[in-house]
């Protein structure tokens, strides 16, 4: 986006056209006391003083890498190569704005085109868009897309879906008249989902690995949904799992959405993240967001442009499929760079390392006398604690161990106060796992 200066002459000309004597006249309807209220800011300070102040505030936090760290539950700590941050800080890329002018944004458009290709290959589906805000909003958009495709109103959310994804979907989709059937939290939710599908169902939303870490082959759910004319939406919160598990497309998914934070992006205090969205080609005109397409110019040279951008800034609001605006383009770039550095074999190896660390974690937890509830897992497990999981987390924190996420923090009303979610990635060491085991034994 280019900067357009506003000179005193320009300002005077505009004021003259509207008949205003000065800029203050534009705000005459605002009470004088409310125009420039005293804010009470601290006195100004130099750069060194500000740096000291902010460093002191930052020191109150505990960095994820400061000790043994086992938190996951939708946000995962992975190693991000220094190359990623170096490339995304190039001036050609350092923006989240939409590349509306293809003649000056070919680099950004090509990167997004490659991003779409990568997402389509990971999910096993035909077409992917140029990213969503995050995984949860992508989930909500997928449900509304299913409403448009099937012209039905009911969406069934599996009990294994991350509670925050379910809540976000309820918040957004209810405004479109959707009936959101949210099933109770369950470690193994496959049978309940299949039983709930009927002729009124627009879509079924399942997550694998689910919020409890359970890996599920959703092929049977796909068959049951399609038999009733419903769509299957598969959610993934840990994108590294694509390197080891069956893709959603292989299992019969019509739409796949995911959180892409695990690849190329840090934890970032919970955001910004990047949503992945893919579907079968026959549904592409109902897909939200933007797509980048490859074309040729008048001289036959290859180029990239925005295409099928059915959002309300581009077409009539009543015809739009979404209102996604300035979004996660920079995070999508980071995702694409990291994945390109890994390659297919590298992603597979990374996924296997994650699974191996999780197996080591499971063995340590069981050796400490706790029950592991997750039968099939990737890099995350659910553990039953002896008492409230939140109390155990606080106790272990005093020992310097960040021992996962109590499920009660995600869904306080689920009645699963004694369930703790633990995650291990390639950043987790054997010493970290030993420290957790020792802390649990005390």
UniProtKB/Swiss-Prot annotation:
Domain of life: Bacteria
Gene Ontology molecular-function annotations: glycine dehydrogenase (decarboxylating) activity
UniProt keyword Mitochondrion, yes or no: no
Reaction it catalyzes: N(6)-[(R)-lipoyl]-L-lysyl-[glycine-cleavage complex H protein] + glycine + H(+) = N(6)-[(R)-S(8)-aminomethyldihydrolipoyl]-L-lysyl-[glycine-cleavage complex H protein] + CO2
Keyword Oxidoreductase among UniProt keywords: yes
GO biological process terms on file: glycine decarboxylation via glycine cleavage system; nucleoside metabolic process
Complex and partners: The glycine cleavage system is composed of four proteins: P, T, L and H. In this organism, the P 'protein' is a heterodimer of two subunits.
Protein name: Probable glycine dehydrogenase (decarboxylating) subunit 1
Organism: Phenylobacterium zucineum (strain HLK1)
């Amino acid at each position: 986006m280019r900067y357009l200066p506003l000179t005193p002459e320009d300002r005077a000309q505009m004021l003259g056209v509207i008949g205003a004597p000065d800029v203050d006249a534009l705000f005459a309807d605002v009470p004088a006391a409310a125009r420039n209220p005293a804010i009470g800011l601290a006195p100004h300070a130099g750069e060194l003083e500000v740096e000291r102040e902010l460093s002191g505030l930052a020191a109150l936090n505990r960095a994820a890498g400061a000790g043994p760290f086992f938190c996951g539950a939708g946000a995962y700590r992975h190693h991000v190569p220094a190359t990623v941050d170096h490339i995304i800080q190039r001036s050609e890329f350092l923006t989240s704005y939409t590349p509306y002018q293809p003649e000056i944004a070919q680099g950004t458009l090509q990167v997004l085109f490659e991003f779409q290709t990568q997402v389509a290959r990971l999910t096993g589906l035909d077409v992917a868009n140029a990213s969503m805000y995050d995984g949860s909003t992508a989930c909500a958009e997928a449900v509304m897309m299913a409403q448009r495709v099937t012209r039905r109103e009911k969406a069934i959310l599996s009990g294994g879906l991350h509670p925050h994804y379910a809540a976000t979907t309820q918040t957004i989709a209810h405004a479109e008249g959707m009936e959101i059937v949210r099933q109770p939290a369950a470690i193994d939710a496959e049978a309940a989902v299949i039983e709930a599908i009927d002729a009124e169902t627009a879509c079924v939303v399942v997550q694998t690995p689910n919020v409890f870490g359970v890996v599920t082959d959703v092929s049977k759910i796909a068959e049951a949904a399609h038999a009733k004319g419903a769509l299957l939406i598969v959610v993934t919160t840990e994108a590294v799992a694509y390197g080891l598990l069956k893709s959603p497309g292989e299992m019969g998914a019509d739409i796949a959405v995911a959180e892409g934070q695990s690849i190329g992006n840090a934890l970032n205090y919970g955001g910004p993240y990047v949503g992945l969205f893919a579907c079968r080609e026959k549904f592409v005109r109902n897909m939200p967001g933007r797509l980048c397409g490859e074309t040729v110019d008048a001289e036959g040279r290859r180029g990239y442009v925005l295409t099928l951008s059915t959002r309300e800034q581009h077409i009539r609001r009543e015809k739009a499929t979404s209102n996604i605006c300035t979004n996660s383009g920079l995070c999508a770039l980071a995702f694409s760079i990291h994945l390109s550095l890994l390659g297919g074999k590298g992603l597979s190896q990374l996924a296997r390392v994650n699974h191996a660390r999780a197996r080591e974690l499971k063995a340590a937890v069981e050796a400490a006398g706790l029950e592991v509830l997750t039968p099939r897992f990737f890099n995350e497990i659910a553990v039953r604690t002896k008492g409230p999981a939140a109390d155990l987390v606080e106790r272990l924190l005093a020992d310097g161990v960040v021992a996962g996420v109590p499920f009660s923090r995600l869904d306080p009303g689920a009645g699963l106060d004694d369930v703790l979610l633990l995650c291990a990635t390639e950043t987790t060491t054997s010493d970290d796992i030993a420290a957790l085991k020792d802390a649990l034994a005390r």
